[in-house]
From Swiss-Prot:
It is a multi-pass membrane protein. Keywords: Antiport, Cell inner membrane, Cell membrane, Ion transport, Membrane, Sodium, Sodium transport, Transmembrane, Transmembrane helix, Transport. It holds the Pfam family Na_H_antiport_1. This is Na(+)/H(+) antiporter NhaA 1.
Protein backbone atom coordinates (compact mmCIF):
# COMPACT_ATOMS: atom_id res chain seq x y z
CA UNK A 1 0.00 0.00 0.00
CA UNK A 2 1.47 3.39 -0.94
CA UNK A 3 2.45 5.98 1.66
CA UNK A 4 -0.41 8.36 0.81
CA UNK A 5 -3.01 5.66 1.45
CA UNK A 6 -1.41 4.66 4.76
CA UNK A 7 -1.37 8.29 5.91
CA UNK A 8 -4.95 8.76 4.74
CA UNK A 9 -6.21 5.71 6.61
CA UNK A 10 -4.34 6.64 9.79
CA UNK A 11 -5.72 10.17 9.74
CA UNK A 12 -9.28 9.05 8.94
CA UNK A 13 -9.18 6.53 11.80
CA UNK A 14 -8.04 9.15 14.33
CA UNK A 15 -10.62 11.58 12.97
CA UNK A 16 -13.37 8.99 13.32
CA UNK A 17 -12.52 8.45 17.00
CA UNK A 18 -12.51 12.21 17.70
CA UNK A 19 -15.79 12.72 15.85
CA UNK A 20 -17.38 9.97 17.94
CA UNK A 21 -16.08 11.47 21.20
CA UNK A 22 -17.24 14.96 20.16
CA UNK A 23 -20.72 13.66 19.35
CA UNK A 24 -20.98 11.80 22.66
CA UNK A 25 -19.82 14.93 24.52
CA UNK A 26 -22.45 17.04 22.72
CA UNK A 27 -25.24 14.62 23.63
CA UNK A 28 -24.12 14.38 27.27
CA UNK A 29 -23.93 18.16 27.61
CA UNK A 30 -27.26 18.71 25.82
CA UNK A 31 -28.91 16.39 28.35
CA UNK A 32 -27.26 17.81 31.46
CA UNK A 33 -27.41 20.99 33.51
CA UNK A 34 -24.81 22.42 31.11
CA UNK A 35 -27.33 22.56 28.24
CA UNK A 36 -27.93 26.35 28.48
CA UNK A 37 -24.19 27.00 28.26
CA UNK A 38 -23.87 24.67 25.25
CA UNK A 39 -26.61 26.43 23.29
CA UNK A 40 -25.40 29.87 24.37
CA UNK A 41 -21.95 28.95 23.08
CA UNK A 42 -23.34 27.91 19.70
CA UNK A 43 -25.37 31.13 19.44
CA UNK A 44 -22.53 33.53 20.24
CA UNK A 45 -22.85 36.31 17.62
CA UNK A 46 -19.76 36.65 15.44
CA UNK A 47 -19.47 39.53 12.96
CA UNK A 48 -16.80 40.34 10.40
CA UNK A 49 -16.82 43.71 8.64
CA UNK A 50 -14.68 45.04 5.80
CA UNK A 51 -15.68 48.54 4.69
CA UNK A 52 -19.37 48.30 3.69
CA UNK A 53 -19.36 44.51 3.72
CA UNK A 54 -20.57 42.89 6.93
CA UNK A 55 -21.18 39.23 7.71
CA UNK A 56 -22.91 38.56 11.04
CA UNK A 57 -23.83 35.02 12.06
CA UNK A 58 -24.06 32.93 15.22
CA UNK A 59 -21.05 30.70 15.87
CA UNK A 60 -22.98 27.59 14.75
CA UNK A 61 -23.45 28.99 11.25
CA UNK A 62 -19.80 30.09 11.03
CA UNK A 63 -18.93 26.45 11.69
CA UNK A 64 -21.48 25.11 9.20
CA UNK A 65 -20.93 27.69 6.45
CA UNK A 66 -17.30 28.67 7.03
CA UNK A 67 -15.31 25.78 8.47
CA UNK A 68 -17.23 23.25 6.39
CA UNK A 69 -16.15 25.15 3.27
CA UNK A 70 -12.59 24.16 4.24
CA UNK A 71 -13.78 20.55 4.55
CA UNK A 72 -15.26 20.71 1.05
CA UNK A 73 -12.02 22.26 -0.21
CA UNK A 74 -10.26 19.12 1.01
CA UNK A 75 -12.93 16.90 -0.56
CA UNK A 76 -12.46 18.74 -3.85
CA UNK A 77 -8.67 18.35 -3.71
CA UNK A 78 -9.04 14.62 -3.07
CA UNK A 79 -11.50 14.25 -5.94
CA UNK A 80 -9.26 16.12 -8.37
CA UNK A 81 -6.18 14.10 -7.41
CA UNK A 82 -8.06 10.79 -7.59
CA UNK A 83 -9.49 11.55 -11.04
CA UNK A 84 -6.16 12.78 -12.44
CA UNK A 85 -3.64 10.36 -10.98
CA UNK A 86 -5.29 8.08 -8.41
CA UNK A 87 -7.62 5.09 -8.37
CA UNK A 88 -10.32 6.95 -10.30
CA UNK A 89 -7.93 7.75 -13.16
CA UNK A 90 -8.35 4.16 -14.38
CA UNK A 91 -11.89 3.63 -15.73
CA UNK A 92 -11.91 -0.06 -14.76
CA UNK A 93 -11.47 0.90 -11.10
CA UNK A 94 -14.33 3.38 -11.19
CA UNK A 95 -17.28 1.41 -12.54
CA UNK A 96 -18.09 -0.82 -9.55
CA UNK A 97 -17.76 1.91 -6.87
CA UNK A 98 -19.83 4.27 -9.06
CA UNK A 99 -22.56 1.66 -9.40
CA UNK A 100 -22.42 1.00 -5.65
CA UNK A 101 -22.55 4.72 -4.85
CA UNK A 102 -25.57 5.26 -7.11
CA UNK A 103 -27.39 2.35 -5.47
CA UNK A 104 -26.39 3.70 -2.06
CA UNK A 105 -28.03 7.03 -2.90
CA UNK A 106 -31.20 5.80 -4.59
CA UNK A 107 -32.00 3.16 -1.93
CA UNK A 108 -31.99 5.46 1.14
CA UNK A 109 -33.78 8.25 -0.75
CA UNK A 110 -36.61 5.91 -1.76
CA UNK A 111 -37.05 4.61 1.79
CA UNK A 112 -37.14 8.17 3.14
CA UNK A 113 -39.72 9.23 0.56
CA UNK A 114 -41.88 6.20 1.44
CA UNK A 115 -42.24 7.52 4.99
CA UNK A 116 -42.55 11.24 4.19
CA UNK A 117 -44.15 11.70 0.76
CA UNK A 118 -47.29 13.30 2.23
CA UNK A 119 -45.38 16.03 4.12
CA UNK A 120 -43.76 18.68 1.88
CA UNK A 121 -41.63 20.09 4.73
CA UNK A 122 -40.32 16.68 5.78
CA UNK A 123 -39.77 15.76 2.13
CA UNK A 124 -36.98 18.36 2.00
CA UNK A 125 -34.83 15.88 3.93
CA UNK A 126 -34.82 13.17 1.25
CA UNK A 127 -31.05 13.53 0.72
CA UNK A 128 -30.11 13.25 4.42
CA UNK A 129 -29.72 9.42 4.48
CA UNK A 130 -27.86 9.33 1.14
CA UNK A 131 -24.56 10.53 2.65
CA UNK A 132 -21.60 8.51 3.93
CA UNK A 133 -19.20 9.76 6.61
CA UNK A 134 -15.82 8.61 5.30
CA UNK A 135 -13.94 9.52 8.48
CA UNK A 136 -16.28 7.57 10.74
CA UNK A 137 -16.42 4.57 8.36
CA UNK A 138 -12.63 4.41 8.15
CA UNK A 139 -12.49 4.74 11.94
CA UNK A 140 -14.60 1.58 12.28
CA UNK A 141 -12.32 -0.22 9.81
CA UNK A 142 -9.32 0.81 11.90
CA UNK A 143 -10.80 -1.03 14.90
CA UNK A 144 -10.32 -4.28 12.95
CA UNK A 145 -6.57 -3.72 12.79
CA UNK A 146 -4.07 -4.82 10.16
CA UNK A 147 -6.05 -7.87 9.06
CA UNK A 148 -8.30 -5.68 6.87
CA UNK A 149 -7.21 -6.23 3.23
CA UNK A 150 -6.16 -3.18 1.23
CA UNK A 151 -8.89 -4.02 -1.31
CA UNK A 152 -11.62 -3.40 1.30
CA UNK A 153 -10.14 -0.04 2.24
CA UNK A 154 -9.70 1.02 -1.37
CA UNK A 155 -13.25 0.04 -2.31
CA UNK A 156 -14.75 1.90 0.67
CA UNK A 157 -12.57 4.98 0.05
CA UNK A 158 -13.42 5.09 -3.66
CA UNK A 159 -17.14 4.60 -3.04
CA UNK A 160 -17.15 7.28 -0.33
CA UNK A 161 -15.26 9.74 -2.55
CA UNK A 162 -17.83 9.27 -5.33
CA UNK A 163 -20.58 9.61 -2.72
CA UNK A 164 -19.05 12.95 -1.68
CA UNK A 165 -19.05 14.11 -5.29
CA UNK A 166 -22.75 13.29 -5.64
CA UNK A 167 -23.46 15.03 -2.31
CA UNK A 168 -21.83 18.20 -3.68
CA UNK A 169 -24.09 18.06 -6.75
CA UNK A 170 -27.18 17.47 -4.57
CA UNK A 171 -26.35 20.46 -2.35
CA UNK A 172 -25.76 22.68 -5.40
CA UNK A 173 -29.04 21.72 -7.09
CA UNK A 174 -31.52 21.12 -4.27
CA UNK A 175 -30.36 23.19 -1.29
CA UNK A 176 -30.01 26.71 -2.63
CA UNK A 177 -32.21 29.64 -1.59
CA UNK A 178 -33.29 32.72 -3.57
CA UNK A 179 -30.42 33.73 -5.81
CA UNK A 180 -28.77 37.16 -5.92
CA UNK A 181 -27.70 38.02 -9.47
CA UNK A 182 -25.16 40.60 -8.29
CA UNK A 183 -23.43 38.19 -5.91
CA UNK A 184 -23.48 35.43 -8.53
CA UNK A 185 -21.81 37.83 -10.98
CA UNK A 186 -19.02 38.51 -8.46
CA UNK A 187 -18.72 34.77 -7.84
CA UNK A 188 -18.47 34.14 -11.57
CA UNK A 189 -15.70 36.73 -11.87
CA UNK A 190 -13.81 35.11 -8.97
CA UNK A 191 -14.13 31.67 -10.58
CA UNK A 192 -12.85 33.03 -13.89
CA UNK A 193 -9.88 34.62 -12.10
CA UNK A 194 -9.07 31.35 -10.30
CA UNK A 195 -8.87 29.40 -13.52
CA UNK A 196 -6.96 32.23 -15.20
CA UNK A 197 -4.35 31.95 -12.43
CA UNK A 198 -4.13 28.23 -13.15
CA UNK A 199 -3.95 28.82 -16.90
CA UNK A 200 -1.06 31.32 -16.72
CA UNK A 201 0.89 28.96 -14.48
CA UNK A 202 0.65 30.54 -11.02
CA UNK A 203 1.87 27.83 -8.62
CA UNK A 204 1.78 29.64 -5.27
CA UNK A 205 -1.20 28.84 -3.04
CA UNK A 206 -1.68 32.37 -1.59
CA UNK A 207 -3.27 34.01 -4.70
CA UNK A 208 -5.76 31.15 -4.98
CA UNK A 209 -6.68 31.39 -1.29
CA UNK A 210 -7.21 35.18 -1.50
CA UNK A 211 -9.48 34.88 -4.54
CA UNK A 212 -11.14 31.88 -2.88
CA UNK A 213 -12.08 34.04 0.12
CA UNK A 214 -13.75 36.55 -2.21
CA UNK A 215 -15.54 33.64 -3.89
CA UNK A 216 -16.75 32.30 -0.52
CA UNK A 217 -18.26 35.67 0.47
CA UNK A 218 -19.90 36.08 -2.94
CA UNK A 219 -21.36 32.57 -2.88
CA UNK A 220 -22.54 33.09 0.72
CA UNK A 221 -24.39 36.25 -0.34
CA UNK A 222 -25.71 34.68 -3.55
CA UNK A 223 -28.06 32.11 -2.03
CA UNK A 224 -25.99 29.11 -3.17
CA UNK A 225 -24.53 27.27 -0.19
CA UNK A 226 -21.15 28.79 0.67
CA UNK A 227 -19.40 25.45 1.17
CA UNK A 228 -19.47 24.90 -2.60
CA UNK A 229 -16.88 27.67 -2.93
CA UNK A 230 -14.39 25.24 -1.40
CA UNK A 231 -15.01 22.69 -4.15
CA UNK A 232 -14.60 25.27 -6.92
CA UNK A 233 -11.38 26.56 -5.36
CA UNK A 234 -10.03 22.99 -5.23
CA UNK A 235 -10.64 22.50 -8.95
CA UNK A 236 -8.39 25.50 -9.71
CA UNK A 237 -5.42 24.47 -7.53
CA UNK A 238 -2.61 23.25 -9.83
CA UNK A 239 -1.58 19.64 -9.43
CA UNK A 240 1.89 20.12 -10.94
CA UNK A 241 4.64 22.29 -9.44
CA UNK A 242 7.03 24.55 -11.34
CA UNK A 243 9.56 21.72 -11.35
CA UNK A 244 9.45 18.12 -10.07
CA UNK A 245 11.68 19.23 -7.18
CA UNK A 246 9.12 21.83 -6.02
CA UNK A 247 6.39 19.21 -5.65
CA UNK A 248 2.67 19.53 -6.26
CA UNK A 249 0.77 22.55 -4.84
CA UNK A 250 -2.36 20.40 -4.68
CA UNK A 251 -0.59 17.62 -2.77
CA UNK A 252 0.97 20.12 -0.37
CA UNK A 253 -2.34 21.85 0.39
CA UNK A 254 -4.14 18.52 0.75
CA UNK A 255 -1.49 17.30 3.19
CA UNK A 256 -1.71 20.51 5.23
CA UNK A 257 -5.50 20.40 5.42
CA UNK A 258 -5.91 16.71 6.30
CA UNK A 259 -5.04 17.07 9.97
CA UNK A 260 -6.84 20.41 10.39
CA UNK A 261 -10.03 19.04 8.87
CA UNK A 262 -9.92 15.56 10.36
CA UNK A 263 -8.75 16.45 13.85
CA UNK A 264 -10.32 19.90 14.34
CA UNK A 265 -13.05 20.90 11.88
CA UNK A 266 -15.05 17.66 11.67
CA UNK A 267 -14.98 16.97 15.44
CA UNK A 268 -16.01 20.61 16.05
CA UNK A 269 -18.82 20.25 13.52
CA UNK A 270 -19.98 17.05 15.23
CA UNK A 271 -19.88 18.75 18.64
CA UNK A 272 -21.91 21.68 17.34
CA UNK A 273 -24.55 19.61 15.54
CA UNK A 274 -24.94 16.31 17.41
CA UNK A 275 -26.53 17.70 20.57
CA UNK A 276 -29.87 15.87 20.66
CA UNK A 277 -32.14 16.22 23.67
CA UNK A 278 -33.29 12.84 24.97
CA UNK A 279 -35.94 14.41 27.21
CA UNK A 280 -39.24 12.62 26.67
CA UNK A 281 -37.63 10.26 24.19
CA UNK A 282 -39.80 7.23 23.59
CA UNK A 283 -40.80 4.80 20.91
CA UNK A 284 -43.23 7.37 19.52
CA UNK A 285 -40.33 9.74 18.70
CA UNK A 286 -38.29 6.99 17.07
CA UNK A 287 -41.36 6.15 14.98
CA UNK A 288 -41.77 9.71 13.68
CA UNK A 289 -41.66 9.62 9.84
CA UNK A 290 -38.51 11.76 9.55
CA UNK A 291 -36.61 9.71 12.15
CA UNK A 292 -37.80 6.42 10.63
CA UNK A 293 -37.07 7.50 7.07
CA UNK A 294 -33.52 8.55 7.89
CA UNK A 295 -32.74 5.75 10.35
CA UNK A 296 -34.01 2.99 8.06
CA UNK A 297 -32.66 4.78 5.00
CA UNK A 298 -29.16 4.60 6.44
CA UNK A 299 -29.52 1.10 7.90
CA UNK A 300 -31.53 -0.67 5.19
CA UNK A 301 -31.47 1.64 2.19
CA UNK A 302 -27.68 1.88 2.08
CA UNK A 303 -26.97 -1.84 2.38
CA UNK A 304 -29.75 -2.85 -0.03
CA UNK A 305 -28.82 -0.11 -2.50
CA UNK A 306 -25.06 -0.73 -2.49
CA UNK A 307 -25.22 -4.54 -2.42
CA UNK A 308 -28.10 -4.74 -4.87
CA UNK A 309 -26.42 -2.46 -7.40
CA UNK A 310 -23.02 -4.19 -7.08
CA UNK A 311 -24.58 -7.67 -7.36
CA UNK A 312 -26.65 -6.68 -10.41
CA UNK A 313 -23.65 -5.02 -12.12
CA UNK A 314 -21.57 -8.16 -11.52
CA UNK A 315 -24.38 -10.41 -12.79
CA UNK A 316 -24.87 -8.38 -15.98
CA UNK A 317 -21.13 -8.06 -16.61
CA UNK A 318 -21.18 -4.27 -16.31
CA UNK A 319 -18.44 -4.50 -13.67
CA UNK A 320 -16.71 -7.36 -11.91
CA UNK A 321 -16.30 -7.88 -8.19
CA UNK A 322 -12.60 -7.91 -7.20
CA UNK A 323 -11.53 -11.51 -6.68
CA UNK A 324 -9.78 -10.55 -3.45
CA UNK A 325 -13.12 -9.49 -1.89
CA UNK A 326 -15.80 -11.92 -0.74
CA UNK A 327 -19.49 -11.07 -0.92
CA UNK A 328 -19.61 -11.08 2.88
CA UNK A 329 -16.85 -8.47 3.00
CA UNK A 330 -18.64 -6.33 0.42
CA UNK A 331 -21.77 -6.60 2.55
CA UNK A 332 -19.79 -5.35 5.55
CA UNK A 333 -18.61 -2.38 3.48
CA UNK A 334 -22.20 -1.70 2.38
CA UNK A 335 -23.22 -1.58 6.06
CA UNK A 336 -20.41 0.87 6.85
CA UNK A 337 -21.73 3.11 4.07
CA UNK A 338 -24.79 3.54 6.29
CA UNK A 339 -22.73 5.67 8.68
CA UNK A 340 -23.98 9.04 7.51
CA UNK A 341 -23.19 11.05 10.61
CA UNK A 342 -21.37 14.35 9.86
CA UNK A 343 -22.36 14.54 6.18
CA UNK A 344 -25.96 13.62 7.01
CA UNK A 345 -26.03 16.17 9.85
CA UNK A 346 -24.74 18.79 7.43
CA UNK A 347 -27.38 18.08 4.78
CA UNK A 348 -30.02 17.96 7.54
CA UNK A 349 -29.03 21.47 8.62
CA UNK A 350 -29.57 22.67 5.05
CA UNK A 351 -32.87 20.83 4.67
CA UNK A 352 -34.59 21.73 7.93
CA UNK A 353 -32.82 24.52 9.77
CA UNK A 354 -32.87 26.92 6.82
CA UNK A 355 -36.57 26.32 6.14
CA UNK A 356 -37.62 29.96 5.91
CA UNK A 357 -41.31 30.38 6.62
CA UNK A 358 -41.61 26.82 7.91
CA UNK A 359 -39.20 27.34 10.80
CA UNK A 360 -41.31 25.64 13.48
CA UNK A 361 -42.01 22.51 11.45
CA UNK A 362 -38.45 22.52 10.16
CA UNK A 363 -37.03 22.74 13.68
CA UNK A 364 -39.13 19.77 14.84
CA UNK A 365 -38.06 17.75 11.81
CA UNK A 366 -34.43 18.74 12.46
CA UNK A 367 -34.58 17.16 15.93
CA UNK A 368 -36.14 13.98 14.56
CA UNK A 369 -33.56 13.98 11.75
CA UNK A 370 -30.64 14.12 14.18
CA UNK A 371 -32.14 11.23 16.12
CA UNK A 372 -32.55 9.19 12.93
CA UNK A 373 -29.00 10.00 11.82
CA UNK A 374 -27.46 8.99 15.15
CA UNK A 375 -29.47 5.77 15.51
CA UNK A 376 -29.10 4.67 11.88
CA UNK A 377 -25.38 5.47 11.80
CA UNK A 378 -24.72 3.72 15.12
CA UNK A 379 -26.51 0.48 14.20
CA UNK A 380 -24.94 0.46 10.71
CA UNK A 381 -21.47 0.93 12.19
CA UNK A 382 -21.89 -1.83 14.79
CA UNK A 383 -23.32 -4.32 12.26
CA UNK A 384 -20.66 -3.45 9.67
CA UNK A 385 -17.93 -4.03 12.25
CA UNK A 386 -19.41 -7.39 13.31
CA UNK A 387 -19.89 -8.64 9.72
CA UNK A 388 -16.33 -7.71 8.72
CA UNK A 389 -14.89 -9.14 11.93
CA UNK A 390 -16.73 -12.42 11.28
CA UNK A 391 -15.68 -12.62 7.61
CA UNK A 392 -12.04 -11.78 8.34
CA UNK A 393 -11.92 -14.31 11.20
CA UNK A 394 -13.27 -17.04 8.89
CA UNK A 395 -10.73 -16.14 6.24
CA UNK A 396 -7.93 -16.18 8.82
Amino acid sequence: MNRWLKNMLHNEAASGVLIFLAAVAAMLIENSSLEPYYNSFLNIPVAVQFSELKIAKPLLLWINDGLMAVFFLLVGLELKREFLEGQLAQPANVVLPVVGAVGGIVGPALIYVMFNYTNPVALQGWAVPTATDIAFAMGVLALLGKRVPAAIKLFLLTLAIIDDLVAIVIIAIFYTSDLSVGSLTVAGGAIALLFLLNRIGVKGIAPYVLVGMVLWVAVLKSGVHATLAGVVLAMAIPIKGETPEHGSPLHALEHDLHHVVGLVILPLFAFANAGVSLAGLGLNVLLEPVAMGIGLGLLLGKQIGVMGAVWLANLLGVAKKPESLSWTQLYGVALLCGIGFTMSLFISSLAFEHSGAQVVAGAADAGHARLGILSGSLVSGVLGYLVLRFSLARKG
